[in-house]
Amino acid sequence: LYTTFSGGRATLYGHNHPANMRRFSGTTGEDVTDYLVRNQLEMLKSLKDDDPRSRDITAIPTMPQLRTTRHIRGVRTLTTADVFRPAEDSVCLINDFDNRDSLYEVPLGCLVSEDADNLLAVGRAASAEGYAWDVLRVIPPAILTGQAAGAAAAQAIDEKCSVRDVNIPKLQKTLEAQNVLIHMTPDLLPKDGAEGHI
């Protein structure tokens, strides 16, 4: 298991991050190379220092595993304040992977660039901040936002308009026909109320 050695046994939440290790943006070739070299050296040091008889089998990934790099500045930005908040222009319903009862309606505006006409971004490249970005970056939300962006782009072509001007109810109907949940319903909300899940 690579995560046993990765970054000095760093966790998903940044615990055990190696002391004095800088943050990496992952936005330049030099930065990615520096990240890879330092990470491999950290892993090799960990292997050298450990008892060889107590090691797990390990595989070293062939790609950098950077979580946060660049993302768009959207027409809307998903934040933690949006948990359990209905969004009129929602294109999918996602949940927090750490707290599956915490639901977010993802507005189309989070996928639409504020600065570049007809540019859509999904998953970790969509517009979100803070912990809401962590919720949006994982694979299931990336799939759902990708499906929504594809449907929005196709509809914009059909309607001969900018993607930010598509008919939202029509887009939602298209996505619902593809079995995408768009809005929260009472049966999806926690029985003990939303307060304990925020």
Residue ranges and their predicted role:
Residues 1-198:
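Flavin (FAD/FMN)-binding glycine-rich loop and adjacent Rossmann-like elements that form
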